[in-house]
Amino acid sequence: MMLRSRHEISKLLAYNRWANARMLEPVAAVSAEEWDRDVGGSFGSLHGTLTHIYAGEWVWLERARGQSPRSLPTNEDLPTLEALRGEWRSLEEGISEFARGLSPAELARPITYTNFVGVNWTYTVADILFDLVNHSTYHRGQIATLLRQLARTPVSTDYVKFFDSGGFAQPDRTPGELARLFAYNRWANMRVLRSVSEIPAEDYGRAVGGSFSTLRDTLAHLYGADWVWLERFAGRSPRALPEGQQAGTPQVLEQKWRQVEEGWAALVGELEPERTREKLAYTNFKGDPLSYCVGEVLVHLVNNSTYHRGQVATLTRQLGRKPASTDYLMMLDEA
């Protein structure tokens, strides 16, 4: 079980609501044509991708309540941004109300639901709620890519920025919870690398637009974030991330990444509860001194990786390939 307390659920759900609101800010400026333009994403357009994020949150709330919907809301149900925002506000209130009274026993309660093709699945309430947030983060990354491809500028939804904005300030992370988060992150990153390993070099480095333009550079950024935070935990403050060309082929990048992942496994495996509540001080790329609670930095890193894996999926699909599925619940099924 990923979440063990109502406090932790409240933090993640409050972050998710904050991030969704920020995500929608630049969307308000797009034209009607851009709203529905098929740009080759997993769900075609901005409209389709936003509907999918909303629908994912809706269906997981229904399942956590013990229901088994047989279909998702569609673009026709949510034709405009105004309609989507109105329904989303009501949904977020419903999610908050559901989570507000959950006890540890209720978090651990298994829920069995029937999916859209008639197959039964069972997960705990805690894992369902974590997947709800993780799924939204993944597709917010895709929205950022689509906005840039439409010559728009997305807004940052980094987890640590949520704390800067006045979000929950009291950490409550257990070493076991963090170890499971990092096991998921490693599993997901390796699945992504395997899925792109056969992409030709010319496609791997082809500029298709997005936050980092190419698939190679997006993966290099994803790796670089893992690397730079590990450096910061070692007391160093690098002044830049590795460039895309330095990352090399997917096979070379995987070798480098496995070394970083081993470093994270050792660090997280040795965490004591009191360490998760300490501050990590470092200097960012601009030379500014910053500090955040260790536990929340680690959650930020995994959330950031999920976000950029969503971007990798969009670029992979736009290159005519099938992206890897990295849902948290899929990892549980494979365990």
Language-model features, listed with the residues they occupy:
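Short, contiguous alpha-helical
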Residues: 6, 10-25, 32-74, 116-170, ...
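Intrinsic disorder/low-complexity detector
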Residues: 173-174
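Carboxylate-rich helix-loop segments that flank metal/cofactor sites and access channels
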Residues: 104-116, 273-285
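Helix-adjacent hinge/juxtasegments
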Residues: 67-107, 236-276
